[in-house]
Amino acid sequence: DAVEVHAGHGDLISQFLSPYTNHRKDEFGGSLENRMRFMRMAMAEVMAAAGDDMAVLVKMNTRDGFRGGMEVPECIEVAKALEEIGVHALILSGGFVSRAPMYVMRGAMPIRSLTYYMQQFWLPIGVRIAGHMMIPTVPFKEAYFFEDALKFREAVKLPLVYVGGLVSREKIDMVLDAGFDGVSMARALLNEPDFVNRMAREENARNACEHANYCIAR
């Protein structure tokens, strides 16, 4: 029924968009308009292939989450460009996996679990020693992208899906009441797959996910 194109988190489209990774001197680098060129070309192909039979959603950053990356004003311009292209909805996230991974997820990364599948004998040792410096903790708070996402709600008219730290019906209602058209959850549903049904029954439903990130590390 739908396809989601990932244009955030340091994936390929995000690497073209971000001045942190895009150092090109040709028509694909430099100004924001040039850095958006690859995205426009890719999305034109996606929209043509989807036709009238499939919804096209794009996950994108509200900001990269570190100095030298994209900030909210530039990301809003990206959102406006995607609206102009005709995508059907945006999923608003943030962070850059290779540079600011915990800005995406928040909380601490359980380093010992992260090394579980590393086969070279020396690699787990090094990661366990320096892991917390390599992947610094970013404090978790519920609905942690909400303030930035509100600025996008004011700037564009297309449907917006909020993602980021939703673990209670109270906060989900807050997001929907603010004009967002949907929400996305991951860790909360890994912790409790039936959580959406429980929220329908319980006004004060809250998920027990502690955002310990063991599901990410393993």
Where are these regions (language model features)?
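Flavin-dependent oxidoreductase catalytic cores
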Residues: 1-218
